[in-house]
């Protein structure tokens, strides 16, 4: 058992901590990844202590030198975590004392693990968001550039998983790119709101030692300083916001994955996944399974669960710090790791995807042009509701005769409406169909080209802000 007296907080305790309690209380296995940012925060705080007259110049130099040594040990993988190390803060402070002696005990003057850990977490997540944003922008770029290259490929568009209208393959790709751009913007907004410095808030009442928080803000590259110490040490809005944005991002990636899973089936055959992003069956030798996409789809549920877990932790807490908040790190670290992996795999899938243009063209059946038949009558002056009915009658007549709608004779069509004339034959042309959707956001080539250019500009802007 670990002695209570060995703890940073052990002065008023006697005896030893129950071993199961020790295990439950420890977070070092999870929060080791905070090691570097914890050292950064300590270096900044040491400088603030020296400015406040708590540390001498010599003491500051010894502390900074010791912290640099600890940072080097972590980076080389030689830092030895001991059983008594309750968390990353305890581990680093214990090691600092081993290196420089009792002077290390001055570093925590006026500082609490309450403001220390939330500062560490913000520092790490700001960096993590930058990495995630870079991977996300690469995925968006891959979608956009593929859309530009394959702009002349036409496929059926679907609603309710039923054939609806002809669209450009590029329109499909860009629909996902646009959703992901919103996710990129949201990540930037979360990072901006996260950049509020909590260090210097103490346990809950603030810092009594005239610590220069502006110095801390500048040293740690935060945009502003927290307004209220009680709020600063307990707020985890930034964790919830990041997990919420991650949830939306995973919804969009899951939708993309589901679309491509369907399109890659033998029944559709629109796309073929690269072997690098597929697996086989242990029993069925003919199988090529889209496991990469299925895993992306399933990871969405994992991220949703992490958000729900953090929300449930927060919803019953009183003000200021409570140990419940220790649960935030495992959840958010897992989501960061999941997003980082998923985005790279998604980019790989899109960049190596084989498009089967011939199969897409075969699926462009004449019934997809039924709406165009109604629009033909609208352009002849018929109200749309009447034109919709007339087109529906043409579909029914073709089904009754057992022929495709484009095989109806002019006489057949005239029996439905006298407005049909010989030029109706132009309706049954796939390219003409997609080219009529010229309004902003439509699937005409001019509109898709405009979307591509606008997305390129948005990508450039987002990259500058990432």
UniProtKB/Swiss-Prot annotation:
Which pathway does the database say it acts in? Amino-acid biosynthesis; L-arginine biosynthesis; L-arginine from L-ornithine and carbamoyl phosphate: step 3/3
GO BP? arginine biosynthetic process via ornithine; arginine metabolic process; L-arginine biosynthetic process
Q: Where is this site: Increases basicity of active site His?
A: 294
Keywords on this record?
Amino-acid biosynthesis, Arginine biosynthesis, Eye lens protein, Lyase
Instruction: Name a single GO cellular component.
Output: cytosol
The EC number on file is 4.3.2.1
Catalytic residues, per the record, are: 160 (proton acceptor), 281 (proton donor)
Q: Which reaction does it catalyse?
A: 2-(N(omega)-L-arginino)succinate = fumarate + L-arginine
Select a single GO molecular function from the record's annotations and give it. Answer: argininosuccinate lyase activity
Which residues are listed for 2-(N(omega)-L-arginino)succinate binding in this entry? 27, 114, 159, 289, 321, 326, 329
Tissues in which the protein is found: Eye lens.
Name a Pfam family for this protein: ASL_C2
Q: Which family does it belong to?
A: Belongs to the lyase 1 family. Argininosuccinate lyase subfamily.
Role according to the record: Delta crystallin, the principal crystallin in embryonic lens, is found only in birds and reptiles. This protein may also function as an enzymatically active argininosuccinate lyase.
Subunit and partners: Homotetramer.
| Additional information | It is uncertain if this gene is expressed.
- Name of the protein in question: Argininosuccinate lyase
């Amino acid at each position: 058992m670990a002695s209570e007296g060995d703890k940073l907080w052990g002065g008023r305790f006697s005896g030893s901590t129950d071993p199961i309690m020790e295990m439950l209380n420890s977070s070092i296995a999870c929060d080791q990844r905070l090691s570097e940012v914890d050292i950064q925060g300590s270096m900044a705080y040491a400088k603030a202590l020296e400015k406040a007259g708590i540390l001498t110049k010599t003491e500051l130099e010894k502390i900074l030198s010791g912290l640099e040594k600890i940072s080097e040990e972590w980076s080389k993988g030689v830092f030895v975590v001991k059983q008594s190390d309750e968390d990353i803060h305890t581990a680093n402070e214990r090691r600092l004392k081993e290196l420089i002696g009792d002077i290390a005990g001055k570093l925590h003057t006026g500082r609490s693990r309450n403001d220390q850990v939330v500062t560490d977490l913000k520092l790490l997540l700001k960096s993590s968001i930058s990495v995630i944003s870079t991977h996300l922008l690469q995925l968006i770029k891959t979608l956009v550039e593929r859309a530009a290259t394959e702009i002349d490929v036409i496929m059926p568009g679907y609603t309710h998983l039923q054939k609806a209208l002809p669209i450009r393959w590029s329109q499909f790709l860009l629909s996902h790119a646009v959703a992901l751009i919103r996710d990129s913007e949201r990540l930037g907004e979360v990072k901006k709101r996260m950049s509020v410095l909590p260090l210097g808030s103490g346990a809950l009442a603030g810092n009594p030692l005239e610590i220069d928080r502006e110095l801390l803000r500048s040293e740690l590259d935060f945009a502003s300083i927290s307004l209220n110490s009680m709020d600063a040490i307990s707020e985890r809005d930034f964790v919830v916001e990041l997990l919420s944005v991650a949830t939306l991002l995973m919804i969009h990636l899951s939708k993309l994955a589901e679309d491509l899973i369907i399109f890659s089936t033998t029944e559709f055959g629109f796309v073929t996944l690269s072997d690098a992003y597929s697996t086989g069956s242990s029993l069925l030798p003919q199988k090529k399974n889209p496991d990469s996409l299925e895993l992306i789809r399933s990871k969405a549920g994992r991220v949703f669960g992490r958000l729900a877990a953090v929300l449930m932790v927060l919803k019953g807490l009183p003000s200021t710090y409570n140990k419940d908040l220790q649960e935030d790190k495992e959840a958010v670290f897992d989501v960061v790791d999941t997003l980082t992996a998923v985005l790279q795999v998604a980019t790989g899938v899109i960049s190596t995807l084989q498009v089967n243009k011939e199969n897409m063209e075969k699926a462009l059946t004449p019934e997809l042009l039924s709406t165009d038949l109604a629009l033909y009558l609208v352009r002849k002056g018929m109200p749309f509701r009447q034109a919709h009915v007339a087109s529906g009658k043409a579909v029914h007549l073709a089904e009754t005769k057992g022929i495709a709608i484009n095989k109806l004779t002019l006489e057949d069509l005239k029996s439905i409406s006298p407005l049909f004339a010989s030029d109706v034959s132009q309706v049954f042309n796939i390219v003409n169909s997609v080219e009529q959707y010229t309004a902003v956001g439509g699937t005409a080539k001019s509109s898709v080209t405009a979307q591509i250019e606008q997305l390129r500009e948005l990508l450039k802007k987002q990259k500058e802000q990432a």
